[in-house]
Amino acid sequence: IDPTNPDTRKYVWQRVKENYVDNGVDLLWFDEAEPEIHPEHFDNLILSLGNGDEVGLIYPYYYAQLVYDGMKEMGRDDIVTLSRCAYIGAQKFGTLVWSGDIPSTFESLRKQVKSGLNMAMCGIPWWTTDIGGFYGGDIESDEFRELIVRWFQYGVFCPVFRLHGSRNGHDRTRDIIEPSGGDNEVGGFGDRGYGI
């Protein structure tokens, strides 16, 4: 979609409203607001404001505005949209940003501290991370058990405390296409982690 085009924003909002908001969903999770394009080169993106390599970074700003304008038109003033990306100024649209699908490593945790500080310095107050990382993390590993405890400790000081991820150690006992992930909460890693 091209959220820089006002007509596109109106069209997409109408679909979102009809399929979600009118059915009681009033907090939306907009993933892939970077935008996610393949191959991953902004020069492959053409927007109404110009070529992607010139204006592509503004994409998440208008992506957030899409929901905000629609909710405002409905008379809402308590608007929050969870988004994987933002642009300076998107905070006025109630954008709650998380850092995306990140690995479950101590290096990634270190980078989240920097990312959170950078977001705050950009004036975007609602920022969070996938506590424990999004992908990886062997639930049987002592290193991962330590990591998730430390990440929970960091998460307490983030503006939004959010746990989300896909862990190794999937439940393959049921005959389903996508098995359930392994434990993803501190309490699932034994008394030591829970006590901390």
Give the label of every model feature segment:
Residues 1-196:
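Catalytic-domain carbohydrate-binding cleft regions of carbohydrate-active enzymes
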